[in-house]
């Protein structure tokens, strides 16, 4: 959703939803044997527009051992009911985002979806924006107080094996001793996975040299 616009509810099928979700999951790079970190596709990471969408009301796993377009698994409604290609879906998003999805070249190009509800029509052009509806909810329903909590709606899978090496790399990243690879211009981070297959680093300096060489590829 975009912060400044409205929320429109559209009717689609489970097949449409999964196509949309697969497109979003393409934001991640595929996992290769020896990878100990997940990473992002450089073209998507550096795009002018946000293309990393997440989904509420459902639970799912993104299996990064599979190629882009075939990664969404275990797709269910929040109540545990499985979602199939023919399952009726009501999905809420900003109309600007829907336009991006259905335009020429978009993942849902050529498809049209009936509008079931539009917050601008219901509440007005100003009061029907996501921003003002959120303000109204927080002030009128939550009395100005909101405590966030993890929703645990989705998960990544694919990093298997190399547990010892992964733990070492994780600790080095979290301590700030090393960083994940970034693009050559330094603007975009985590554009490649750290891979330890057939690599033995005698010290942190050797690891730093490897990471520097990896960044030069981007």
In which residue ranges do the predicted regions lie?
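Catalytic centers of hydrolytic enzymes
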Residues: 1-218
């Amino acid at each position: 959703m975009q912060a400044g616009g409205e929320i429109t509810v559209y009717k689609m099928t489970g097949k449409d939803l999964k196509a949309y979700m697969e497109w979003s999951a393409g934001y991640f790079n595929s996992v290769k044997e020896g990878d100990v970190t997940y990473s992002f596709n450089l073209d998507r990471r550096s795009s002018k527009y946000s293309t990393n969408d997440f989904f509420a009301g459902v639970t799912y796993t993104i299996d990064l051992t599979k190629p882009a377009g075939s990664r969404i698994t275990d797709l269910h409604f929040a109540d545990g009911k499985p979602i199939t290609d023919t399952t009726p879906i009501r999905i809420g998003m900003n109309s600007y985002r829907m336009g991006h999805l259905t335009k020429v070249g978009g993942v849902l190009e050529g498809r049209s979806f009936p509008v079931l509800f539009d917050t601008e029509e219901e509440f007005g052009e100003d009061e029907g924006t996501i921003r003002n509806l959120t303000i109204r909810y927080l002030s009128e329903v939550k009395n100005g107080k909101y405590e966030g909590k993890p929703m645990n709606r989705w998960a990544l899978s694919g990093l298997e094996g190399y547990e010892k090496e992964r733990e070492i790399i994780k600790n080095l990243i979290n301590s700030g001793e090393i960083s994940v690879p970034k693009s050559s211009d330094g603007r975009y981070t985590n554009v490649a996975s750290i891979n330890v297959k057939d690599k033995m680093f005698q010290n942190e300096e050797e690891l730093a040299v490897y990471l520097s060489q990896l960044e030069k590829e981007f």
